[in-house]
From Swiss-Prot:
Protein name per the record: Small ribosomal subunit protein bS20
Record SUPFAM superfamilies: Ribosomal protein S20
GO cellular component, one term: cytosol
Described function: Binds directly to 16S ribosomal RNA.
Gene behind the chain: rpsT
Protein family (similarity comment): Belongs to the bacterial ribosomal protein bS20 family.
Native organism taxonomy: Bacteria, Bacillati, Bacillota, Clostridia, Moorellales
Superkingdom, taxonomy of origin: Bacteria
Molecular function (Gene Ontology), one example: small ribosomal subunit rRNA binding
Amino acid sequence: MLLLPGSHVKIVREVNKVPNIKSAMKRVELTRIRTLRNKAIKSSVKTAIKKFRTALEQGDNHNAAVNLRQAIRAIDKAVTKGVLHPNTAARKKSSLQRYFNKTTA
């Protein structure tokens, strides 16, 4: 932290601290790897949902039904990998199914 003379403004500098302890270094590396994996899984879920929504908005009910199953499968996989909480997954699946039912009815 740096305090400029004659002012009350503090400038905080962020410093990437690298741990010295071997186990802490390993935890940092594992966190980085898991973050990348979680991002990839979340991205696949979002992509599946977008495919479903675009198919439904184009009026292709058959393709939308196929994409709905794929989106639900991607959401369930994210739950088994520990990326999404089960309640979050249930909420997403429910909203997708309601949207499908409302649009195709």
